[in-house]
Amino acid sequence: MVKSICKCTALCGSSLLILMAAVSAQASDGQVEFTGSINDNACTISTENVKKSVDLGQVRVGDFANTVGATAGSVPFSISLENCSSATLKNAAITFRGQQSSSDPTILGMTGANQVAGVGIQINDARTGAKLPLNTASTDYVLRPQSNTFDFTASYVRLVADTEGADGKPGVRGIGTGQVNALASFDVTYK
């Protein structure tokens, strides 16, 4: 009988040891991090519009009328929004921002060294043809479900007029020649 109790105690002790080892192998600490965001955007900006390039091409100084505000080289461009839901927000407005011209704060100025003097970039709303000043929201666009495309134009704009010289001598040209680079960002405001 003592031998049987010893066997049972040894067997039970071994089983208990195995059970404790199994339990301690399953007990492991870990961590799960959940991230995300909640926004009130009605749409997402199309990936092709996150970093967009618009080539205004080459124009001649003579393509500009000799008045401040004269434009040349108008080029259309678009901003597309996708995955739109107009369930709560029905309209959107676009605001362009960037380095303002020192001559006219409503015009996008040149960036970088050795830029052409006397010109800037003017953005117009293609729906109306009206100038869209920097840091000023466009009129509202009505959002449609899924995809929306908003059309604009960009053009060179004269900021300095030519001056006439005295005594028949040539005057000073208001526009220089060379490379043009300007950078604008845009914000979409949902209403």
Regions from the language model: what does each represent?
Residues S15-A25:
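C-terminal segment of classical bacterial N-terminal signal peptides
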Residues V2-C8, V23-K191:
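Mature extracellular/passenger domains of Gram-negative fimbrial/pilin and adhesin proteins
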